[in-house]
Each structure stands twice: as C-alpha cells, then as structure tokens.
C-alpha cells in the first residue's frame, strides 16, 4: 500500500490519535470547516456587542481567520492573544463580552493544540487539494434527511448504510465507473 493518505479531522485528541495509529506517515490536517465554524460563532457574538473605541472585534476575528487560511499559525495566535487581553478588560462591562472572551480563550487553545496540523489552506485550495470535509458532510446530511422524511417511512439498516458509504467513497475516489 504505497498510497498517499490525507486525514482531515476536527482536532479532537481521540480522532488524531487514531489517525496516527493507523497511518503515521500520512498527512494529517485540521479540517478548515471546523475552524470556520468556530470563527463564525465568534463573529456572531461580536455582532451582538456594542462598538467600542478600543478594538474592532470583527476585524480582529477576520485577521485571525486570514492568518489561519494562509497557514500563519504564529501570527493568528498573536492576534488571538491580543483579542483575548483586549476583551478581558471589557468583561465586567457586558455579559456578551464575557461569552466572547471565553470563546476566544477556547479557540486559542484549540488552535495551539492543533497548530502542527494547520497547513496553508489558501495554497492547498489553489492547487485543488482537499481542505475540508464539508462537501461530504453536506451530501450525507442530504441523503439521510431525504431518507428519513416521514412520508417515505424508510429507515436505515446497517447493511444499507454500509452500502451507501461504499458507493459514496467510490464516487469521491473516481472509482465508481470502474465498478461496472
């Protein structure tokens, strides 16, 4: 098996350990989808906070996202640290700031723990390389929700779900036509 493998994960310890156990020399990446989910939540929190003269929260969060997109984890963590300390001074003034402050702190730890798995997503995207599992998750959600509509009264069997995943994997690997 001399096939290159790229693992995309949400950054959880268990998943990462499993990847390293299964195939240590493979490429291990943090899924961009999971980064943007967290960034989007922080932006929504920032929208609910009254503007201050001290810092433009949304602009700072955008900077963090930009640095991560370009694989500059060091600068992303610096900006995140600055944002964390700026918010720390405002925590007493507004409960919404406290929520964002905690989210930024959690995000800071998440990025620091997964820094070794953050590539230059912009370059990977430019060269047509996979950066996210969002398209797979979206497809699976569509198929499952279609199947679970009450009018159709269909339920998944273990065999049916397994067969669906085999077909989907073949389609994604451009192997589907070879089956026939």
Task: Write out the residue ranges for each language-model feature.
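Catalytic center-proximal scaffold of phosphoryl-transfer enzymes
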Residues: 1-180
């Amino acid at each position: 098996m001399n096939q290159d493998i790229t693992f995309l994960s949400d950054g959880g310890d268990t998943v990462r350990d499993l990847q390293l156990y299964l195939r240590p020399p493979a490429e291990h990446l943090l899924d961009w989808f999971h980064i943007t989910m967290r960034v989007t939540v922080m932006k929504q929190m920032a929208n609910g906070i009254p503007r201050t003269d001290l810092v433009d929260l949304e602009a700072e969060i955008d900077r963090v996202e930009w640095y991560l997109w370009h694989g500059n984890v060091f600068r992303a963590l610096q900006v995140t640290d600055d944002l964390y300390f700026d918010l720390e001074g405002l925590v007493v003034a507004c409960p919404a700031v406290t929520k964002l402050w905690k989210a930024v702190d959690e995000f800071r730890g998440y990025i620091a723990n997964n820094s070794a798995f953050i590539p230059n997503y912009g370059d990977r995207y430019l060269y047509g390389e996979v950066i996210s599992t969002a398209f797979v998750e979206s497809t699976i959600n569509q198929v499952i929700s279609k199947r679970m509509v009450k009018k159709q009264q269909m339920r998944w069997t273990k065999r049916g779900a397994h067969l669906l995943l085999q077909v989907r994997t073949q389609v994604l690997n451009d192997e589907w036509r070879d089956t026939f």
